[in-house]
Structure formats: C-alpha cells, structure tokens
Amino acid sequence: MKTYLQLLEHILQHGVEKSDRTGTGTLSVFGYQMRFDLAQGFPLVTTKKLHTRSIVHELLWFLRGDTNISYLKENGVTIWDEWADNNGDLGPVYGKQWRSWPTADGRTIDQLSEVVQQIKSNPDSRRLIVSAWNVGELDKMALMPCHALFQFYVANNKLSCQLYQRSADVFLGVPFNIASYSLLTHMVAQQCNLDVAEFIWTGGDCHLYLNHLEQAQIQLTREPLPLPSLAIKRKPASLFDYAYEDFEFLNYQSHPAIKAPIAV
C-alpha cells in the first residue's frame, strides 16, 4: 500500500491550507488517482490497523438499501453515529440512492441491480455507472455523498471499478473507501462469473484535517507489510444475499491502530 502513503506524503508536501464545513481546517490538494491491482492482493492499509468488521458491515448495509443505523449498531459498527438523528435515521443517503433512486414519475430505480444485469448481458457498455449524488435529495441527507459515483469496466473477462470521491478524508476515510469498493468489485465479479482486475480511486478535494497531520506523519514512518488476500466462502443467489460470515481476509498483518478525531 505504498500508493496510499504516497498520497499522504503528497498532501503534506503540496497541500494548501483551507477552511472547511466542520471548522477544523485542512491541508488539501485537488485531483489525485491511485490504482490497485486486485489480483496482487486485497488493498487493506497495513501501516495502521483497520476495523474490517466496520468495512464489511457498512457495505452490506449499503447493499440492503438501508439508511437507518440500527443494523450497524446491532453489529458493533459506530462509524455513522455522529450523523444520525434521534431515531437513527440519516435521510436518503447511499443505500437509498443505490437501490431505490426516485424518479419524477413516482417510480424507483435499483441502480445496482440494473448495472449487474448490464454487466452480464452487455459487458462492453460504457454506462455501467451507479451514482449517489442525487441533486434533488441532497438537502435531505445527513451527510452528502463523499464517494459520489462509481463505474465498472469489463475487459478480457476481468472486472475493474473506478470510484470518484468528491471529498476525501485521506487519513480516516480513504482507507475504508479503498477496501469497501475493492470488496464490492470482488462481489460483483463473483456474481457475474468474472475475475477481478483493478480498483481505481479518483479523488477530488483530497485533504488531511489539521488535527490529523501528526498521525499521518507517524504512519509515514512505518514500512508497509504484505497485502492480505480475500476469500469469499460461498456464492449467494444475488449481490444482495451476502452475509458478514462469507468473507475472510487471509494473512492480514498490520501496524497498530492510530487514533484520530472525526470531523463532524
């Protein structure tokens, strides 16, 4: 995962100081891309320990079309707690947009189901896109989508995925996002009887919060360890039928966790 460390270093060297919605302040660069060959290992950051349980359960929660944190709480995941209302609701965030995007005529569109079917029936399509950036519902969301849009691509019987992340909390958020979308790529590939190729991460406003700079510098002193591999233990009937127990990260070694405050 030297690629990720290079992004940390790039921001520390070239970032400009900016104000932000949370009032914390950031060092920021605009426009950055990282590529991960999924055949060479699963891209879990090894220079600090990641909570893989949160990564897997959050993705399963998105895939359920759920926007209430009760499922996450039941499974020991707290990463959305700060944004939920008193009933645990977040408004029409990722899961709602992925699975039931509302149309002007009162229908809803299951973007993910449609894309999986398109990959199977028309793998050369250039329209294999899922968007969470629903302009008409942004003001109802507890947090507007940071990872806003992703696109699949099939070549040589292998599946790639590219994510566009308009706002990237590089120390806390991006390691989760890389792992989450890499996991999704593996799952979609399995459902479509494809091998995996690349996960490509493209960031817009890529930033380190000013109260994360010391933590980023600590991480840069650590030598990356070999990447783990992902085992998917069964192939369920659909993309939406996976369970937490279906996934195992084999030989995940990491340096200790590094604590950092969340900017709300």
From Swiss-Prot:
Q: Which HAMAP family match?
A: Thymidy_synth_bact
Q: Which GO terms describe its biological process?
A: dTMP biosynthetic process; dTTP biosynthetic process; methylation
Which catalytic reaction applies to this protein?
Answer: dUMP + (6R)-5,10-methylene-5,6,7,8-tetrahydrofolate = 7,8-dihydrofolate + dTMP
* Quaternary structure note: Homodimer.
Disulfide bond annotation, renumbered to this chain: none
Localization annotation: Cytoplasm
Q: Which family does it belong to?
A: Belongs to the thymidylate synthase family. Bacterial-type ThyA subfamily.
Provide the primary localization: cytoplasm
E.C. number: 2.1.1.45
User: What protein name does the entry list?
Assistant: Thymidylate synthase
What the protein does comes down to:
Catalyzes the reductive methylation of 2'-deoxyuridine-5'-monophosphate (dUMP) to 2'-deoxythymidine-5'-monophosphate (dTMP) while utilizing 5,10-methylenetetrahydrofolate (mTHF) as the methyl donor and reductant in the reaction, yielding dihydrofolate (DHF) as a by-product. This enzymatic reaction provides an intracellular de novo source of dTMP, an essential precursor for DNA biosynthesis.
A Gene Ontology MF term for this entry? thymidylate synthase activity
Q: Where do the catalytic residues lie? A: C146 (nucleophile)
Q: Which pathway does it take part in?
A: Pyrimidine metabolism; dTTP biosynthesis
Keywords on record: Cytoplasm, Methyltransferase, Nucleotide biosynthesis, Transferase
- Gene that this polypeptide is encoded by: thyA
- The positions annotated for binding (6R)-5,10-methylene-5,6,7,8-tetrahydrofolate are H51, D169, A263
- Recorded source organism is Legionella pneumophila subsp. pneumophila (strain Philadelphia 1 / ATCC 33152 / DSM 7513)
Residues reported in the UniProt entry to bind dUMP? R21, R126, R127, R166, S167, A168, D169, N177, H207, L208, Y209
What GO cellular-component annotations does this UniProt entry give? cytosol
